[in-house]
Amino acid sequence: PNKALITGFWSKVKVDEVGAEALGRLLVVYPWTQRFFEHFGDLSTADAVLGNAKVKAHGKKVLDSFSZGVQHLDDLKGTFAQLSELHCDKLHVDPENFRLLGNVLVVVLARHFGKEFTPELQAEFQKVVAGVASALAHRYH
């Protein structure tokens, strides 16, 4: 991946907003992912999900971790080893969900940045989200 391009762009991302929207959209677009978040309260409608404080908080947490990955593109497995263990061994999250969230994140970035999110940037971010998803799914292999 083009590290300079990725980190330069990532520095403009509002992690709390983008994280909240990405996780919220994941839960709305792929409703079966909600089963991991039943303790978050009302997820009955799109508005309920996107307005849910726990979804927003966890979305920020997810993107804070993703930011760590952006800083360590050469060692995604190492960066996400503990989170992989938590999500795979303890929470039994289907690794496909990591790929879905990555794709939703790309959609949200395109929405927030419009023309600035060029096809070249999209190509780079698809590589990054695929790498992160693979690192998170590492415990399944």
Curated annotation (Swiss-Prot):
It comes from Ammotragus lervia (Barbary sheep). This type of beta-C chain is found in these animals when anemia has been experimentally produced. Belongs to the globin family. One of its GO terms (cellular component) is blood microparticle. Heterotetramer of two alpha chains and two beta chains. Keywords: Heme, Iron, Metal-binding, Oxygen transport, Transport. Involved in oxygen transport from the lung to the various peripheral tissues. Pfam families: Globin (PF00042). GO terms for biological process: hydrogen peroxide catabolic process. This is Hemoglobin subunit beta-C. Red blood cells. It comes from the Eukaryota. One of its GO terms (molecular function) is hemoglobin alpha binding. Transmembrane segments: none annotated. Heme b binds at residues 58, 87. InterPro entries: Globin (IPR000971), Globin-like_sf (IPR009050), Globin/Proto (IPR012292), Hemoglobin_b (IPR002337), Hemoglobin_oxygen_transport (IPR050056). Residues 1-141 form the Globin domain.
